[in-house]
Amino acid sequence: AITKSTPVAGLPGRSLVPLFKPGQSNWRTHLYAEYHTHAAAPNFFPQRCVRDGRYKLIESLLPDTLHPDYKNTLTKLHRDYERREARNTLNLMSAIKNAPPKVKQAYALMRKPPRYQLYDLQQDPYEFENLAETPKHTETLNCLRAKLAQWRNDTQDPLLNDEALRQLTQEVQGISKKSSARKHTWRYPTYLSRPSVNK
């Protein structure tokens, strides 16, 4: 409407114009996101996410496997710290080892995420306590899982197909450097274009 352009048929989404007007808008109740990778194998770890006004659910499509970017993330955090605190030193691994239990647990989940992580963003905005296996939150977990599954179906997420996920994982993990990724003839347009099969 603002740009006077014609919407693309079949593309998910809706106008943001109501958000530019004064007052509150009941524009949406849930926000969805997906992640695959930024640079081939070094950080390939596909995840999907949904959140409402209070809770956030993350689904890891390669659950209980080591997150390939865990070590790189710690290295980046260490570098950032050294740039800011040139006079002090930090042994990040030692700091994590000696941290309070909830901090250690958060790093353990980051290193090897389970299938589902559920966080109460009002009570736990930094996402330290995974509530996915807490009986008290079963209803919330199931509701958000259903919303996420519906969104993945509606958007035709190709990684609903187990074979497509397996092929993409194998192809991406076969590339170890960004420079190799640029030269690689990627096959994923072929196998990701097949119809999705729900789990």
Report each predicted region and the residues it spans:
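Residues at helix-coil transition
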Residues: A1-K4, K21, Q123, N153
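C-terminal cap/loop subdomain of S1 sulfatases and analogous C-terminal strand-loop tails that border
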Residues: T3-Q117, E139
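Long, internal low-complexity/basic segments
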Residues: A95-Y116, L121-E127, L131-K199
